[in-house]
Regions:
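Short amphipathic beta-strand starts and helix->beta connectors
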Residues: 22-32, 82, 115-124
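Surface-exposed interaction/gating patches
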Residues: 91-127, 132-141
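Short, low-order "capping/linker" segments at domain edges
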Residues: 79-96, 173-180
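C-terminal binding/interaction regions
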Residues: 25-30, 44, 122, 128-131, ...
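Short amphipathic alpha-helices in soluble, non-transmembrane regions
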Residues: 55-63, 148-155
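Conserved short beta-strand edge segments in small beta-sheet-based binding/regulatory domains
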Residues: 64-77, 158-169
């Protein structure tokens, strides 16, 4: 089943909380992430039926308060799960990392990895202390990770993707940063 995701970035934290309360009172949504981000902004990521996401985005389209908004449709359920929590793993042999220019494309990259490869999303970091950038950490065989990165490079521009890396056979102390 596919979902839609809405992303709102408010220029003021207090104003953001007030808007989120309004959205929750008027629409059926699930909160995926809510973070204060640099410099003094509030990032809100939620999932909902496509019609609700579209209606929420319409409300902010004409807003003159410099609220950044975007939506992504057709997101896999596994990607939604990855947005709201880390994947718990005991061990892995290879790690792929994609650094993305913004939150919207971070979600699209994670979804593309899940839909086009046998890799698993380990963790998605967005916005927090990253000035809007995102990181997707994913695991799989070296060949799956390379194929996923090739697919990402084929589907995104160099302006959208900051960098990609593959870490093969990381040491155990490094793995502990990701394993639970």
């Amino acid at each position: 089943m596919d979902f839609s995701v809405g992303i709102l970035e408010f220029p003021h934290v207090a104003e953001g909380y007030k808007n989120i309360d309004y959205i929750m009172k008027h629409f059926s949504i699930s909160t995926l992430k809510l973070h204060r981000i640099c410099p003094g902004r509030l990032l809100f990521i939620f999932s909902a039926d496509t019609s609700d996401v579209v209606n929420i985005m319409k409300e902010y389209k004409d807003n003159k308060r410099k609220i950044l908004y975007s939506s992504v449709t057709g997101i896999s359920e596994k990607c939604i799960e990855s947005l709201s929590s880390r994947n718990k793993v005991d061990d892995f042999s290879d790690l792929g990392i994609v650094e993305v220019k913004n939150c919207v494309n971070t979600i699209k990259v994670a979804d593309l990895i899940l839909k086009t490869s046998s890799s698993e999303i380990l963790k998605i970091d967005m916005g927090l202390g990253l000035f809007g950038k995102g990181l997707v950490f994913f695991i799989g065989s070296i060949s799956n990770i390379k194929a996923a990165i090739d697919t990402i490079n084929d589907n995104f521009s160099k302006e959208e993707i900051v960098s990609t890396e593959i870490i093969s056979n990381p040491v155990d102390d490094f793995k502990k940063l990701f394993c639970y």
